[in-house]
Swiss-Prot record:
The protein, known as: Uridine kinase
Main location as per UniProt: cytoplasm
Record key words, sorted: ATP-binding, Cytoplasm, Kinase, Nucleotide-binding, Transferase
TM ranges: none
Pathway(s) of this molecule: Pyrimidine metabolism; CTP biosynthesis via salvage pathway; CTP from cytidine: step 1/3; Pyrimidine metabolism; UMP biosynthesis via salvage pathway; UMP from uridine: step 1/1
Catalytic activity of the protein: uridine + ATP = UMP + ADP + H(+); cytidine + ATP = CMP + ADP + H(+)
Length: 209
């Protein structure tokens, strides 16, 4: 191949609208070969510890992720090399033994809460996007999602938010906003900001030859 792939990082707190922004990018570039990689499939393999111990892990902390593996995979995709992407079992809190063979694409979107935390990973991105949404809105979205899709009780969601999600957001996620090239208020509802972002991606695509 002669073209160099473009890597777009999309981050923000839980419930900020990252997925909506990512979907908007994918829809806009549907005529291109595009790949979305979620950071949370790169949680560490925890097959060596018990299920009870896995439940105690703080999954909103940078150390929960196998960032070295993610960096090596993004670097390989930029070289148009095939990777063996992990498959994460969200019910067992560890990786499955199987992997997904992933071919490189023209546009690579990396989505996750902590993708801007490590400079090595930031340096592999052409565009860094932070989806900035009010804390109350993010909490309500997370509450409704976890109760509806994951069978959680209201009390358990609130407890996790106050004890883990909110402090980790304030300590690790919010500070990465300063590394973003583009900040999108109100997530996927901000169509003007998304249009500006996709225009920038198109401009870079034309230069990546």
């Amino acid at each position: 191949m002669t073209k160099k792939p473009i890597v777009v990082g999309v981050t923000g707190g839980s419930g900020s609208g990252k997925t909506s922004v990512t979907k908007a990018i994918c829809d806009h570039f549907s005529g291109h070969s595009i790949l979305m990689i979620a950071q949370d499939v790169y949680y560490h393999d925890q097959a060596d510890i018990s299920f009870e111990e896995r439940l105690k892990v703080n999954y909103d902390h940078p150390l929960a992720f196998d960032t070295d593996l993610l960096i090596s995979h993004i670097a390989a995709l930029r070289r148009y090399e095939t990777i063996e992407k992990p498959i994460y079992d969200y019910e067992k809190y560890t990786r499955k033994q199987e992997v997904e063979i992933q071919e490189p694409r023209e546009v690579i979107i990396l989505e996750g809460i902590l993708i801007l935390e490590d400079k090595r990973l930031r340096d592999l991105m052409d565009i860094k996007v932070y989806v900035d949404t009010d804390d109350d809105i993010r909490f309500i979205r997370r509450l409704l999602r976890d109760m509806k899709e994951r069978g959680r009780t209201m009390d358990s969601v609130i407890d996790q938010y106050l004890s883990v999600v909110k402090p980790m957001h304030n300590e690790f996620i919010e500070p990465t906003k300063k590394f973003a090239d583009i900040i999108i208020p109100e997530g996927g509802e901000n169509h003007v900001a998304i249009d500006l972002m996709t225009t920038k991606i198109e401009s870079i695509l034309q230069k990546h030859v």
